[in-house]
């Protein structure tokens, strides 16, 4: 067998890493827009904002599917799994994340949430993907350490016990979502799966906002513009994330996704003129090292040497 034959496989996985990095960047854009929305005197409730954001993302992806004449429905045999991911995926994860924010600082909640790559590693192993190889473990440790440094630097850490529970529940649900997408969605196009995930999240958050008495539409054009922009960025992020999962699997997707807090910090520096500390630069370097390593690492196979 020629030594050059694996090259297309490596190219596919490199592209997968780039797609996940692009998803992290777009989610960073969403964070910055969300910060700007929260700075107004009477901001739209978070639940309502997220419902509209995910609804816009679903409409954008549906329009893309129609324009490219791709199927709106998932592949046969994957529809039930996609429905479960759509209903219990981003919507439920976001619900617990923002419940946690009511009981702790954003830095503390984000730090706990970014435990999810470890949960992904455990879930992937339980799902039969095997233990990650040494290179992936190194990437995981580097990315998580970097994310922790970025989040903690210059920010207060305070959270109540119930907030810890909510944050870890959010991380666990998101980890299950990533692994479930890796296991279930083999033949469904990324545009299709992203559309239904957005629609499910939008519906779930809409119901929650109504029940909590926190539903309202944006009050002016500025809010509408920001939320629509968030929805468009979310649509692109969903597409890139699904393509990334398909190419590099759930665990390495989780590792590369640690770029998100770094992207948010750098965008805040560019757009909001926030200060970039030495801790952010150090953490960012570790995240980049972990992301690049994860993109280059191969999936664990029976032929690969496993961690003893």
Regions inferred by a protein language model and the residue ranges of each:
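Glycine-/small-residue-enriched transmembrane alpha-helix faces in small-molecule transporters
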Residues: 2-51, 156-183, 204, 306-308
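Helix-helix packing/entry segments at the starts of transmembrane helices
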Residues: 24-25, 51-52, 90, 94, ...
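Transmembrane alpha-helices of multi-pass small-molecule transport proteins
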Residues: 34, 42-92, 119-120, 172-180, ...
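Specific transmembrane alpha-helical segments of multi-pass solute transporters/efflux pumps
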Residues: 26-31, 62, 66-107, 113, ...
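Juxtamembrane helix-entry segments on the extracytoplasmic side of multipass membrane proteins
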Residues: 11-17, 42-51, 74-80, 152-173, ...
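Cytoplasmic-side transmembrane-helix entry/capping segments in multi-pass membrane proteins
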Residues: 16-20, 76-86, 131-144, 163-167, ...
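Hydrophobic transmembrane alpha-helices of multi-pass small-molecule transport proteins
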Residues: 61, 123, 132-153, 171, ...
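Hydrophobic/aromatic residues within transmembrane alpha-helices
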Residues: 37, 49, 53, 100, ...
